């Protein structure tokens, strides 16, 4: 693993769904399945909680985590044990303020990406008219390209926005491997950690506690 995350992480973090589903984290944990990874994470978060680190998620993120885990064979009891070590809180959406410049940039980005998406759709229509490719192949290609040009690297879900707003409200670091959420958080001056970096931070805290006790 790499070095310890910056000390500005503090005692509160807000996590998105990728904290619990990240493939790289699963690899670092040595988990062979999502079920095993969830069990290990529950134990790690329990230890983190005892050291004073609080992990928040929003209701929309919790629902997304549960859907994903249930759909991938994680037992409901395991999910409940994992969720026992996080706090669920919605952002106060009517009281928060965002910089006008950020909102303007976001609208400009959305418009530019929609234009690219339209060109991708037009290209695939022309390809369908002049080629003998299977319809399924063309549709698959269209979906992949359209998603790449219109969604990759930007806020593209309610869950992302909720996570960003809650972190802003709490003045907390964000834990995510999502590129779009990371960029938006950094625009607002928030600290961002990947799921693996959070694990490193927790392990570093444990080492500090041990050294103090000794």
From Swiss-Prot:
Keyword tRNA processing found = yes
Q: Does the keyword Nuclease apply?
A: yes
**EC number per UniProt:** 3.1.26.5
Q: Which reaction does it catalyse?
A: Endonucleolytic cleavage of RNA, removing 5'-extranucleotides from tRNA precursor
Q: What is the protein's name according to its record?
A: RNA-free ribonuclease P
Briefly state the protein's biological role: RNA-free RNase P that catalyzes the removal of the 5'-leader sequence from pre-tRNA to produce the mature 5'-terminus.
Q: Which domain of life is it from?
A: Archaea
Xref: SUPFAM superfamilies: PIN domain-like
> What InterPro entries has UniProt attached to this entry?
PIN-like_dom_sf (IPR029060), RNA_free_RNase_P (IPR014856)
Q: Name one GO biological process term.
A: tRNA 5'-leader removal
Q: Which family does the record claim for this protein?
A: Belongs to the HARP family.
Give the first-level EC class, as a single word.
Answer: hydrolase
PANTHER family linked to this entry: RNA-FREE RIBONUCLEASE P (PTHR41173:SF1), UPF0278 PROTEIN TK1425 (PTHR41173)
One MF annotation (Gene Ontology) recorded for this entry: ribonuclease P activity
What keywords tag this UniProt record?
Answer: Endonuclease, Hydrolase, Nuclease, tRNA processing
């Amino acid at each position: 693993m790499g070095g310890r995350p910056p000390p500005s992480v503090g005692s509160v973090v807000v996590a998105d769904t990728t904290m619990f589903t990240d493939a790289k984290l699963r690899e670092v944990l040595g988990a062979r399945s999502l079920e095993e990874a969830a069990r290990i994470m529950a134990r790690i978060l329990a230890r983190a909680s005892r050291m004073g680190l609080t992990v928040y998620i929003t209701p929309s993120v919790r629902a997304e985590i549960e859907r994903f885990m249930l759909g991938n064979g994680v037992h409901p009891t395991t999910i409940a044990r994992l969720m026992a070590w996080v706090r669920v809180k919605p952002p106060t959406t009517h009281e928060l303020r965002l910089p006008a410049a950020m909102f303007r940039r976001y609208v400009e980005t959305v418009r530019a990406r929609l234009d690219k998406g339209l060109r991708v759709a037009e290209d695939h229509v022309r390809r369908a008219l002049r080629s003998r490719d299977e319809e399924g192949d063309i549709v698959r290609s269209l979906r992949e390209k359209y998603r790449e040009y219109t969604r990759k690297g930007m806020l593209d879900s309610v869950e992302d926005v909720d996570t960003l707003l809650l972190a802003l409200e709490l003045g907390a670091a964000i834990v995510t491997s999502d590129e779009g959420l990371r960029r938006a958080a950094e625009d607002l001056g928030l600290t961002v950690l990947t799921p693996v970096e959070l694990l490193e931070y927790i392990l570093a805290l444990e080492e500090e506690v041990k050294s103090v006790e000794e």
